Each structure stands twice: as C-alpha cells, then as structure tokens.
C-alpha cells in the first residue's frame, strides 16, 4: 500500500488520498484511490446521517438523481460493472455528477464496504454550499477532474497523444 497526502491549496486543508491495490481489479492491474477531505467533512459534521451497513447499495448505475452525498464515516466504493473507480472515505463526496449534469441518471454504483454514514445533500443545498464556500466548489471541481482523468486512463489508453503515428516525441 502506498500512501500519499496532498495539500489542497485552495481550501488550506489537507486532503487524504491513498492508493491501494484492489482485489476486484487485480486482473486489470488497476490501483484504487481512497479520497476524503476534512474541510468537506466539517461542512456536515452536525448533520444527521444515513447509516449504511457493509454491502448496502446507496445507489445504482442508471438510478434517478436524488442528490449527492458526503461521507461522514466508513468507506464507500464507486464502481461501474467490474471496474472499481475509487473508494470515498470521511470527507469524500459521491453522486456529485448527477447534480452538476442537471439530474442525469447515475453513472456508477456506490455501496458501503463496511458500516458507513453519509449525509445527503440536495440540489439547492449543493448550490448554496458552492456559492458560500469557494473552497468546497474547488474541491468538487478537483474531484470531477480527477475522476475524469482516471476514466481517460482506464478506458482510452489508445487515445493518448504519444500513440498517434506521425507525431514527434
């Protein structure tokens, strides 16, 4: 297991990020990242939580949008089919794409790896949090960017520019 902690310059909080080998993805040689941000967690510290038991599904790919979630405790796994994208731990966010994309269906399944607690954030509260807390907005943008880059690496390695014939290195 390799651990990496990075300083989130925009929010002045330390975001937790860890890379771990996933038994689910060993055949593909994929490394799963676990991610959480203490500053995001602080935004919902006093909010009531939804409790999930290990293996319980929060939402499935294709489900209608009903908000996004911030992980208060435990670990949620994000996957589509047989591919595990990421594990979200305390301070991590899941389901944000559905709000940002104007309520399109869920693009992945999310489930608890063990007992976990999440806080549901509806669309209006999400946009209020973005407007009132620029650091939260930057965090959401970074999460979206990181997940997009990961998807590019997983599904489109042949589209990388170093593989285009005729281009100089």
Question: What is the role of each PLM region?
Answer:
Residues 1-169:
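Cytosolic regulatory regions built on CNB/CRP/Popeye-like sensor folds
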């Amino acid at each position: 297991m390799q651990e990496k902690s990075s300083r989130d310059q925009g929010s002045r909080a330390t975001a937790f990020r860890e890379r771990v080998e996933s038994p689910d993805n060993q055949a593909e040689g994929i490394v799963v990242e676990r991610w959480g941000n203490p500053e995001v967690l602080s935004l919902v510290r006093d909010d009531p939580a939804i409790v999930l038991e290990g293996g319980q599904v929060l939402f499935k790919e294709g489900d209608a949008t009903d908000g996004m979630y911030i992980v208060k405790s435990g670990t949620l796994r994000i996957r589509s089919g047989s591919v595990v994208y990421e594990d979200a731990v305390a301070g991590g966010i899941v389901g944000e794409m559905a709000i940002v994309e104007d309520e399109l269906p869920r693009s992945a399944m999310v489930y608890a790896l063990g007992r976990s607690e999440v806080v549901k954030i509806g669309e209006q509260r999400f946009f209020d949090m973005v407007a009132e807390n620029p650091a939260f907005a930057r965090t959401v943008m970074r999460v979206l960017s990181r997940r997009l880059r990961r998807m590019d690496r997983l599904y489109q390695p042949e589209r990388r520019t170093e593989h285009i014939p005729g281009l100089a290195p």
